[in-house]
Amino acid sequence: MTAHVSDFGLVKFLSNDMIDSANQFSSLGLRGTFGYCPPEYGVGSEVSTSGDIFSFGVLLLEMFTGKRPTDDMFKESFNLHNFVKKALPEHVTQVIDLNLLNMQLNVDATPNHNHNFTRRNNILTECLISILEIGISCSVEFPQERMKVDDVIAQLSSVRKKFLEGRN
């Protein structure tokens, strides 16, 4: 069996004729999961690849910060996107999930790795900043300003290569 991840922001796909009057919401016809659903879906825009990119960006930010986009700390216009954007690049360690940093520090604390600790720590920090910047670029408000799929793949591949080279 092969697992596939797709259309994360489109958990529900509702057409107007599928919504009965007993089950109406104020966001009639809104498709997706709150927090991952791009803003344009709230005003009736069609489902698009750009919407999937938005959802992917939010998911990426969630994975690396450990914060859900629906966290109580996010109110009104302050959201996960803005939380991370405000911190970069100088305060990346203040928004990164500490569990990620602790896992890496445990690996680097072994005797064979101590001589390269500073270099590896710098590479790790650069990679984390790059990944969060990708998440920010994917989750911008306006669809035309979001990264394209090919650019996301290229940049993530570049980060992966840099991270793996830094481990040697």
Show which residues each predicted segment covers.
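Cytosolic eukaryotic protein kinase-like domains
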Residues: 1, 5-168
